[in-house]
A protein has these predicted regions:
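A short, charged, Gly/Pro-tolerant segment at domain boundaries
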Residues: 248-254
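Bacterial N-terminal signal peptides
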Residues: 6-15
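Acidic/histidine-rich helix-loop elements
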Residues: 37-53, 77-82, 116-121, 168, ...
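Serine-esterase "nucleophile elbow" of acetyl-processing enzymes
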Residues: 20-76, 89-98
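Positively charged n-region of N-terminal signal peptides that target proteins for export
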Residues: 1-5
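Alpha-helical cap/lid subdomain in secreted, periplasmic
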Residues: 25, 58-69, 85-247
Length: 254
């Protein structure tokens, strides 16, 4: 066979070889409020400072370091959001992405609304809304693993001092947060989801806890590192796994 003809046949054959499949990336969606969005955080004097990503970005970095190219972490946090807001955008921001893992971090603004005497933001209303969120997830994403992140505060009884008239005086802010965290804890158990007990790993001492907070609610850099580390350890001990070579997508890059 002439050499040029052999080269032509070889090149033609190579061009029609099936493309190598990609290793499937597992998708993690984090949905919540400004603590999840974390493009800025508040200082005590009320000024906003840009930070280099919050716990979602940092969790993604930890996963990429340990499992290169295997996990995609998507941030669906929105500043000021409540449980009702998450319910309203659940289909668009979670279901359509078909995630393998969902992390829900919502409730702090519901607590603030309750303290401001908003009749639509009672613990019962919060429980009802979270139940509806979980119902939709179970119906639309039955194979998805769901985590609910507990809420923390460093305000304790100093809310009225730190925030002025934004919050009324509250003698035991932690007790209010505990009420809502207990709702999350119970519902995750009822729906066979997982509650991430962040409050139990947050510093109890009021002064020490401020080393991890920008304003008593939003974490600072050290706080976001701590949240990301706790979530990473939680995921690692429950659902994270290295991908196998035959774990591939049905579609491939052209």
């Amino acid at each position: 066979m002439p050499f040029f003809l052999w080269i032509t046949i070889a090149c033609f054959s190579i061009s029609f070889l099936p493309p190598s499949p990609l290793v499937a990336k597992e998708v993690i969606v984090a949905i919540g409020d400004s603590i999840t969005q974390a493009d800025t955080h508040w200082t005590v004097n009320g000024h906003r400072n840009t930070i280099q990503g919050g716990w979602v970005t940092r969790l993604g970095n930890l996963l990429e370091k340990e499992f290169p190219g295997e996990y995609e972490v998507i941030n669906k946090g929105i500043n000021g959001d409540t449980a009702t807001g998450v319910l309203q955008r659940l289909d668009r921001d979670v279901t359509l992405l078909q995630p393998d893992i969902v992390i829900i971090a919502i409730g702090t603004n519901d607590i603030f609304a309750r303290l401001s005497a908003d009749p639509s933001s009672t613990p019962d209303a919060y429980q009802s809304t979270i139940s509806r969120i979980f119902n939709k997830l179970q119906r639309n994403l039955p194979d998805t693993t769901v985590f609910a992140l507990g809420m923390t505060t460093s305000l304790r009884k100093y809310a009225h001092i730190r925030f002025g008239n934004f919050l009324p005086q509250q003698d035991d802010m932690q007790a209010v947060f505990n009420d809502y965290n207990n709702i999350l804890r119970k519902l995750t158990k009822d729906y066979k989801y997982s509650y991430v007990d962040l409050p139990s790993q947050w510093p109890e001492d009021i002064e020490e806890s401020w080393e991890f907070c920008a304003d008593g609610i939003h974490p600072n850099d050290a706080g976001y590192d701590l949240v990301a580390s706790i979530l990473h350890d939680t995921l690692r001990s429950t659902v994270l796994r290295p991908k196998q070579k035959n774990d591939t997508r049905s579609s491939v890059m052209p």
